[in-house]
């Protein structure tokens, strides 16, 4: 019973780690979503100055293999995605507008990225809720196994006490 309780506890701890990682990712996606919404508003109003962004290329292990820059000139109605946003969205297969084969977006083009990030945020929230259900299940198992072990110990103590009194 105690071994089963430990197994349930271990499984619950693993799920709690997964939830913690998902919550960290949710924070990042929320930041990227806020960044995209602000960039959309900025694109609508036109850039107050040149905006140059450096982008990096990565290999399959995530190591930087190169870099390049893109510039949105002052007064234009488009602006660039951040390198962090491009990297995250590429790593997770999220859609963003690729018109012009660059990372510059007009107000309307930002909607694609915003919709994708909103969807990812919702997906992470749903996954976290499911993980919490699993934790509740594992904790129920843990409590049940501990109660069973305590009952067995109590019964053994009663048996030993009876034997001791009988001698």
State each model region's role.
Residues 1, 15, 22, 29, ...:
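Amphipathic coiled-coil alpha-helices
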Residues 129-167:
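Proline-poor, low-complexity alpha-helical tail modules
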Residues 34, 45-47, 79, 83, ...:
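Detector for Asparagine
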Residues 75-77, 93, 99-129:
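Fold-level signal for large, globular catalytic cores of enzyme and receptor domains
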Residues 85, 113, 117, 159-160:
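Generic structural signal of hydrophobic/aromatic residues within well-ordered alpha-helices
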Residues 1-105:
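Low-complexity, intrinsically disordered export/secretion signals at extreme N-termini
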């Amino acid at each position: 019973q105690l071994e089963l309780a430990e197994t349930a506890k271990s499984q619950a701890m693993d799920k709690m780690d997964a939830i913690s990682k998902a919550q960290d990712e949710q924070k990042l996606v929320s930041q990227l979503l806020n960044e995209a919404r602000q960039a959309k508003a900025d694109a609508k109003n036109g850039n107050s100055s040149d905006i140059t962004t450096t982008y990096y290329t990565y290999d399959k292990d995530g190591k930087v293999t190169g870099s390049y820059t893109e510039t949105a000139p002052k007064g234009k109605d488009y602006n660039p995605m951040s390198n962090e946003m491009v990297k995250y969205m590429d790593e997770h297969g999220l859609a963003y507008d690729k018109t012009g084969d660059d990372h510059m977006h007009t107000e309307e083009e930002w909607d694609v990225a915003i919709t994708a990030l909103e969807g990812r945020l919702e997906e992470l929230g749903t996954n976290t809720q499911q993980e919490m259900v699993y934790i509740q299940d594992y904790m129920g198992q843990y409590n049940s196994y501990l109660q069973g072990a305590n009952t067995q110990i109590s019964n053994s103590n009663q048996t030993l006490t009876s034997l001791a009194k009988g001698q």
